[in-house]
UniProtKB/Swiss-Prot annotation:
Top-level lineage group: Eukaryota
Location of Phosphotyrosine modifications: 652, 752
Family per similarity comment: Belongs to the protein kinase superfamily. Ser/Thr protein kinase family.
Assembly and oligomerization: Binds to the ammonium transporter AMT1-1.
Known function: Required for accurate photosynthesis.
InterPro entries reported for this sequence: Kinase-like_dom_sf, Leu-rich_rpt, LRR_dom_sf, Malectin-like_Carb-bd_dom, Prot_kinase_dom, Protein_kinase_ATP_BS, Ser/Thr_kinase_AS
Glycosylation sites (chain numbering): 143, 182, 200, 256, 289, 400, 403, 417, 433, 444, 465, 470
Segments forming domain Protein kinase: 579-852
Residue ranges, Extracellular side: 24-510
Gene name for this UniProt entry: PAM74
Transmembrane segments: 511-531
Designated name of the protein: Probable LRR receptor-like serine/threonine-protein kinase PAM74
Cellular component annotations (GO), alphabetically ordered: membrane
Amino acid sequence: MDSPCWLLLLLLGAFAIIGCVQAQDQQEFISLDCGLPMTEPSSYTESVTGLRFSSDAEFIQTGESGKIQASMENDYLKPYTRLRYFPEERRNCYSLSVDKNRKYLIRARFIYGNYDGRNSNPIFELHLGPNLWATIDLQKFVNGTMEEILHTPTSNSLNVCLVKTGTTTPLISALELRPLGNNSYLTDGSLNLFVRIYLNKTDGFLRYPDDIYDRRWHNYFMVDDWTQIFTTLEVTNDNNYEPPKKALAAAATPSNASAPLTISWPPDNPGDQYYLYSHFSEIQDLQTNDTREFDILWDGAVVEEGFIPPKLGVTTIHNLSPVTCKGENCIYQLIKTSRSTLPSLLNALEIYTVIQFPRSETNENDVVAVKNIEAAYKLSRIRWQGDPCVPQKYAWDGLNCSNNTDVSKPPRVLSLNLSSSGLTGIIAAAIQNLTHLEKLDLSNNTLTGVVPEFLAQMKSLVIINLSGNNLSGPLPQGLRREGLELLVQGNPRLCLSGSCTEKNSKKKFPVVIVASVASVAIIVAVLVIIFVLSKKKSSTVGALQPPLSMPMVHDNSPEPSIETKKRRFTYSEVIKMTNNFQRVVGEGGFGVVCHGTINGSEQVAVKVLSQSSSQGYKHFKAEVDLLLRVHHTNLVSLVGYCDERDHLALIYEFLPKGDLRQHLSGKSGGSFINWGNRLRIALEAALGLEYLHSGCTPPIVHRDIKTTNILLDEQLKAKLADFGLSRSFPIGGETHISTVVAGTPGYLDPEYYQTTRLGEKSDVYSFGIVLLEIITNQPVIDQSRSKSHISQWVGFELTRGDITKIMDPNLNGDYESRSVWRVLELAMSCANPSSVNRPNMSQVANELKECLVSENLRENMNMDSQNSLKVSMSFDTELFPRAR
């Protein structure tokens, strides 16, 4: 009686495994439901294909959401019922992160569906980077159209653009990217899909999961001319192209055994060049004396002679160079040889046309530099989409580029004009990466800090306009060179012609005298204050003494010594909110952290300065000053403070789940955190750190990044804490400052330790160690290991290529290995001994975002158990060759 139950369990297990495999297979897919509002769930699983679609909102700045008419919705799958339309700009571009030099299948779908009620089907252009890909004519293809291309990007960013060419409004329904194996479809250029068919008269349309690359296969069969054969045995499809097994399980042979199998079609354009990929498998059980051998011909010429299909395997035959059609029709034939006893056979066929993309994209380094400048100044320019320089009529505002007569040569940025753009902060360091820049105009903004030395090193510059800002300090000597026009008027604090040195030398003697007198006065004042305080304390009997206090030598006036708009609490209020410091939730060199409540409901953490803390007031002051000027969802927020003579306390939001370390270790009742949540926590901590480095002026280095300083709220949202060691950079463009070494052993940047030169990359190193802790759940330093430091131990284990020895065993293998490898590589890159080889926090955050998206897809696919439905869908663009 138990057999049916066991059978059911086995079936469920099998389905779970299949679902898991499918989820992993589409980890690197990009499937965008264009126009899906962010107010709805931002991703979902399409029930027919099992593909995971997400909103396109984060990949494009422009456009509005639309939906096809309700009466048409049942005719299309869910991802194609919405659309994004573009009523404003002439060119609107998606920007997608891809792997440079990796081949992709790129597919775009367009369905008008009378979304606007105007019955006005649009015509517009589709561009890939700066080149025309296709003209989209929805007046001709009223039910929708699709464009599909095989393309190898030459940079890590891919722009897909919709360009308005008339009075109608461009739109897009879905955008899909599928990475392919680099050993398939080896051609010099890109390939535009003409048709992809498998020869079967009964089965229908195939795509993912039958095809692991999500290629679309239409069944095609000429009933009057062909005979179908099929097999129920499994066909091996393990060549570089991996056509679907279902497509190989059937084949067509000529009904007349002596006749050729012929497929012909008229070319769209007389000069079209074709690549054909024919997939063959012998699926018939041949008798002892049976032979199947045939020649493959193109327009009457033999391209493959005496071919014998492999038994239940697959061979893909393709032309090595593009071919054209000689007459009105292109003719593809399979003719059996005189030795063959059986007719020719064909299982599946792909036909592509060569598409030329003659215009090169802008130099990749220039593109990265301009985007970094855009990020540094938080610019939001609608026209800054797609390629910055080409086509020239769509070039970004404020940029002038080299106008090469040779369009195959990448353009370079020659001029950058950001005048009157509301810029604040320092002159962005990314400008120096525009190595061909001739003209720079940053005039009429509110830039501060010094004029950076790197401008003097940019030898191609002939004009620099910095007028109308708040720059200060001396000009670099290199900017006084002949041939350079430098405009700096309207910067009253800027020192010209050595005036800074002269002014300082004139004031040197008076300053020394004043400083000496002031020093004596301060010493006398301090002695008097100490004497008064000691007399006051000796006369106080029975006064309540706090458990942790320290006499401070600072202003005893009623006004606080720390300027703040946050709430100032009295010491008696601190005692009340902590119930006389009853519940201690943490402690360190500064003192203790106590739990408290305000108004009986709002929970807070109260950091109280310890009497034994030698650097206490300095670090306390630093933390308060920093928390007053930073505001980010992934940084602990300040509630208030107490600065009442010798009583100092900092009150900030209470995070009830404690720190990350205790959850990884399982100590103090910390709950287990799965791999997906670990990735999310790492990303949130990275975003907080990125804000300190890039979102603050001047930038801030935390100096003590570690798992115990990453706190978690009720939903396990991560926030960085403990800013007592943090340092701000001088406003100027320096990347390092010299300082006394401080931090936690094991997390401390070895380069910073040796040179005392602190930089943002010092935090990156510490964050890399945190990532290794998140991955391994191992102590940072463990003398019992052969390699005591965690980075050395992981590096040693990586040489063996087995991540199971590195991963936290508590995860029980519940993770996607590719995302783990990416995070491991990222962690080791962050922990590189040399700071120049480490990424910045923006790069770290972006990489973690991609890893988290992959992991979320895996988890969501594992949870999906929706039944599949068969939905028929047709596009007017599907081209079917006719056979004879």
